[in-house]
Amino acid sequence: MGQKVHPKGLRIGIIKDWDAKWFADKKHYQELLHEDLKIRKYIKTKFYQAGISRIVIERASNRVKVTIHTARPGMVIGKGGTEIEVLRKELEKMTGKQININIAEIKVPEIDAQLVAENIAAQIEKRISYKRAMKQAVSRALKMGAQGIKVACSGRLAGAEIARSEWYSEGKVPLTTLRADIDYGFAEALTTYGKIGVKVWIYKGEVLPEVKKESVSTEGGE
C-alpha cells in the first residue's frame, strides 16, 4: 500500500512556511514545544466554532506573537475586542510571558483544507451521510476556485462492523509536484461507533518559489 507524505511538510522551505517560527537550544526546546502545543490546544478548544485553520507562533526572548487564521474573526475578537483581551490574559497566565495576538481572516473557507475536513467531521457527527458530506464539500471547493480536491473518510462508516476507507476526488491533485500549492487538513468525527478520520487535499494551482536576486558582477575589459 502506498503511504502519503504530509503535503505541507514536503513543501516547507519551497512554497510553504513553518507554523512555529522560533529557535531554541536543547535545554529549552522541550519546554517551548510543549508550551506551543498547550497554546494551540487551548485556542482550538475555546474557539472551535470560529473556524480556526492555522495558528502561527513566533517567539523573541520573553515575548510570544500568536497569529490566528480564522474564518470568523468576529467570534475570536468579540464585542469591542473583549474576547481577544480575555484570551491574551489567559495565555499570559498560562505561559508567564508577554503575549501579542493577531487575527488573520480566511477569505474563502471553502478551499481551506482544515476547515473543509472539520466541516465534514461535524456533519458526520450530526448523523448526515458521509457520502453526501464529501460530495457537497468537493462541489463547493471546485465552485470557489480549487483546481482539484480529494477527500478520504476512514473508520466504521455508517456503523459498519468492519472499518474501511472511502475516497472521493475531482480535478487533479499532484501530490509529488513541489511547486503545486496543495493544502492538507485532518479532522476526527466522534460517533457512537468510534472515531472516523477525515483527510482533505486541495490543489489551488502552481506557485513558483521566490528566487533570491543575486547581484552579478560584470567584469569589464580594460
UniProtKB/Swiss-Prot annotation:
Pfam families: KH_2, Ribosomal_S3_C
InterPro entries from the UniProt entry: KH_dom (IPR004087), KH_dom-like_a/b (IPR015946), KH_dom_type_2 (IPR004044), KH_sf_prok-type (IPR009019), Ribosomal_S3_C_sf (IPR036419), Ribosomal_uS3_bac-typ (IPR005704), Ribosomal_uS3_C (IPR001351)
One annotated Gene Ontology cellular component of this protein: cytosolic small ribosomal subunit
Chain ranges of the KH type-2 domain: 39-107
Gene Ontology biological-process annotations: translation
Source domain of life: Bacteria
Protein name as it appears in the record: Small ribosomal subunit protein uS3
HAMAP family, sorted: Ribosomal_uS3_B (MF_01309_B)
GO MF term set: mRNA binding; rRNA binding; structural constituent of ribosome
Keyword flag RNA-binding: yes
Keyword Cell cycle: no
Function description: Binds the lower part of the 30S subunit head. Binds mRNA in the 70S ribosome, positioning it for translation.
PROSITE patterns: KH_TYPE_2
Family, as annotated: Belongs to the universal ribosomal protein uS3 family.
Transmembrane segments: none
Subunit and partners: Part of the 30S ribosomal subunit. Forms a tight complex with proteins S10 and S14.
UniProtKB keywords: Ribonucleoprotein, Ribosomal protein, RNA-binding, rRNA-binding
